[in-house]
From Swiss-Prot:
InterPro entries: NAD(P)H-quinone_OxRdtase_su_N. GO terms for cellular component: plasma membrane-derived thylakoid membrane. GO terms for molecular function: oxidoreductase activity, acting on NAD(P)H, quinone or similar compound as acceptor; quinone binding. This is NAD(P)H-quinone oxidoreductase subunit N. The gene is ndhN. It is a peripheral membrane protein. It holds the Pfam family NdhN. It is an enzyme of class 7 (translocase). Keywords: Membrane, NAD, NADP, Plastoquinone, Quinone, Thylakoid, Translocase, Transport. The lineage of its organism: Bacteria, Bacillati, Cyanobacteriota, Cyanophyceae, Oscillatoriophycideae. NDH-1 shuttles electrons from an unknown electron donor, via FMN and iron-sulfur (Fe-S) centers, to quinones in the respiratory and/or the photosynthetic chain. The immediate electron acceptor for the enzyme in this species is believed to be plastoquinone. Couples the redox reaction to proton translocation, and thus conserves the redox energy in a proton gradient. Cyanobacterial NDH-1 also plays a role in inorganic carbon-concentration.
Length: 158
C-alpha cells in the first residue's frame, strides 16, 4: 500500500458499480482518508451504522413510523399501550433533496455491514440503479489493507 493514495481508482470503481463492499484495517483511519477523497471529488458522504436499521427500504427511501421508548410514562386511555408513533422522513431521500447544487451525489457509508442479511445487501446493491445520484459503501469486514470490490461480488463471497 503506498503511503499516499489519491483514491482515484476507488472513486472510479464506486462510480462504475454504484455500490462497493470495503474491507478495512481494524485499527481504523483508512476509511476517513477515503471519505476525504470522496468529499474532495464532489460527493457528500453520510455515515451510519447497520445496527438497528430495521427495514432498509423504509428507513432509507420511505416515511416510516418510530415508537420511542416510553421510559415508564404512559398516557392511560389516550394512546396505544405501546406508545405514540412518530413519523420520520427517509434518510437517503431527505439527504438527496438537500444536497448542494454542485454536488455529484450522496455516498452512504455504512459501517458494521457484516451483520446485514443477504437480502438487505442485495437491496443495497440495486438501490443506486433506482437513484443514480446515490452511491453505497458498506464495510463488510476487516483486512490487513484497505481493499474494495463491487457489492455483488461481496454477496457471492458470503
Amino acid at each position: 500500500m503506498p503511503l499516499l493514495t489519491t483514491g482515484k481508482s476507488f472513486i472510479r470503481a464506486l462510480e462504475k458499480s454504484g455500490a462497493l463492499g470495503v474491507y478495512v484495517p481494524l485499527e481504523g483511519g483508512f476509511e476517513g482518508r477515503y471519505q476525504r477523497r470522496l468529499r474532495a471529488n464532489g460527493y457528500t458522504p453520510y455515515n451510519l451504522t447497520a445496527r438497528g436499521l430495521g427495514d432498509l427500504s423504509s428507513y432509507l427511501t420511505g416515511i416510516h413510523g418510530v415508537r420511542p421508548p416510553h421510559l415508564g410514562k404512559k398516557n392511560i386511555g389516550q394512546d396505544a399501550a405501546v406508545g405514540p408513533v412518530y413519523f420520520v422522513p427517509p434518510i437517503a431521500t431527505y439527504q438527496l433533496e438537500t444536497l448542494p447544487p454542485k454536488s455529484k451525489g450522496l455516498v452512504l457509508w455504512i459501517i458494521e455491514g457484516m451483520i446485514l442479511s443477504r437480502a438487505e445487501i442485495e437491496y443495497l446493491t440495486y438501490l443506486p440503479q433506482q437513484e443514480p445520484r446515490l452511491k453505497i459503501v458498506v464495510e463488510m469486514g476487516g483486512e490487513r489493507y484497505f481493499r474494495w470490490q463491487p457489492l455483488e461480488q461481496s454477496i457471492q463471497a458470503a
